[in-house]
Design a protein with these regions (language model features):
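Residues at secondary-structure transition points
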Residues: 40, 44, 96, 123, ...
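Conserved GNAT acetyl-CoA-binding A-motif
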Residues: 109-121
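Conserved N-terminal entry element of GNAT/NAT acetyltransferase domains
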Residues: 1-20, 160, 166
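Conserved catalytic-core motifs of GNAT/GCN5-like acyltransferases
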Residues: 118-122, 129, 133, 138-155
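Conserved glycine-rich acetyl-CoA-binding loop
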Residues: 67, 89-103, 112, 123-129, ...
């Protein structure tokens, strides 16, 4: 899965995350999701991340010189895959890393027999919808928002389900 590229002339590789990556992953994810001020607390914690990594896989983009700059979660759910928690270090957003990780996640899910992939986008993050549409996703439904995090009082939020055939 290693595939070098460059970012600020530093070679990158995409690989599966390991338990040793969890501290750096926590920092990366919580930094990338800090824009979600409509929710209390951080995006994830070590226990949740450990549980996710037992259930599915996290892909990371890592500078060969060291340091994680992006990640995405994948999970096989029968004939469909799920992708979530796409995080890009704020200093590297807009550099193509999101697309690169989405493609890696899609390749992985396809190799596991998935014919489609689903994602969920919080309704408060409408700026993400055009990004996922450019990646080929279409809106297919809504789900109730549920998380250990608490919404800011007075804020409404639900999950927009988007899907893509692989």
């Amino acid at each position: 899965m290693d595939s070098p590229t460059s970012l600020d002339s530093s070679p990158l590789r995409v690989r599966l995350a390991t338990a040793d990556d969890r501290p750096a992953l926590l920092s990366l994810i919580n930094s990338a999701f800090s824009i979600e001020t409509f929710l209390d607390g951080t995006r994830t914690d070590d226990a949740q991340l450990a549980g996710m990594m037992e259930k599915g896989n996290m892909f990371v983009a890592e500078k060969v010189s060291g340091g994680l700059v992006a990640s995405v979660y994948t999970e096989v759910r029968g004939a469909r895959g799920y992708m979530g928690m796409l995080a890009v270090d704020p200093a590297h957003q807009g550099s193509g890393l999101a697309r690169r990780l989405v493609l890696a996640a899609e390749d992985y899910l396809r190799s596991r027999g998935c014919g489609a992939v689903d994602i969920t986008v919080l309704s408060q993050r409408t700026e993400l919808l055009p990004l996922y549409r450019r990646f080929g996703f279409v809106e297919t439904g809504r789900e109730e928002f549920s998380t250990p995090r608490t919404l800011t009082p007075g804020v409404e939020c639900y999950c927009i389900v988007m899907s893509k055939e692989l």
